[in-house]
Amino acid sequence: MNSLQKIAMVIDADNTQISKIEAVIREISKHGRIVVKRAYGNWKKDTLKNWEGEIKRLAIKAEQQFDYVSGKNATDMALVIDTIELLYANIYDAFVIVSSDSDYTPLAIKLHESGVYVMGVGERKTPEAFRTRCDEFIFLQNLSPEGRSSAAKK
């Protein structure tokens, strides 16, 4: 892969470990310049309280998404809508989706069909359908604190 000029990275905080985010950013930065770093979640939830310090330190834009119905979050939908808006801006040559959620498979397909490079980052449990629709998928378990990884490439 050639060096990418402008990378947009979107993070599903509900399905990602904050302890790995710095290593993810370091790894993705090897491919090019990350110009968008956004994390989506309901930051009012106790489960995401530990993200605040890292979000500030790593200059990630936190996108608040409230849960409109008990037991159901809207984070996935907000992330997808924003990503499609970024795609139609026509200024990014790569998108990184950080999540282990198979719900992002249609998004990866749309991005891929639009001709941009698609990278996924998630746990080994990430469904194959999502992993294979990415041009490259990086397993969180393979990222060390120093940012070295073993990526699965197509």
Region roles according to the model:
Residues A108-L140:
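VWA/integrin I-like adhesion module and closely mimicked acidic/polar interface patches used
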Residues N15-Q17, W43-D46, S102-Y104, K125-T126, ...:
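Conserved nucleotide-binding/hydrolysis micro-motifs of P-loop NTPases
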Residues E146-K154:
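N-terminal regulatory modules in eukaryotic regulatory proteins
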Residues I7, D93, D135:
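Conserved acidic residues
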Residues Y40, D93-S100, L107, L111, ...:
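Acidic beta-strand-to-loop metal/phosphate-binding motif
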Residues K72, K125-A129, P145-G147:
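Short gly/pro/ser/thr-enriched loop/turn and capping motifs at secondary-structure boundaries
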Residues A13, D67, S100, V116, ...:
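Short, ordered loop/turn segments at secondary-structure junctions
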Residues M1-Y88, I109-K110, Y117:
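Domain-level signal for Mg2+-assisted phosphodiester chemistry and nucleotide/NA-binding surfaces
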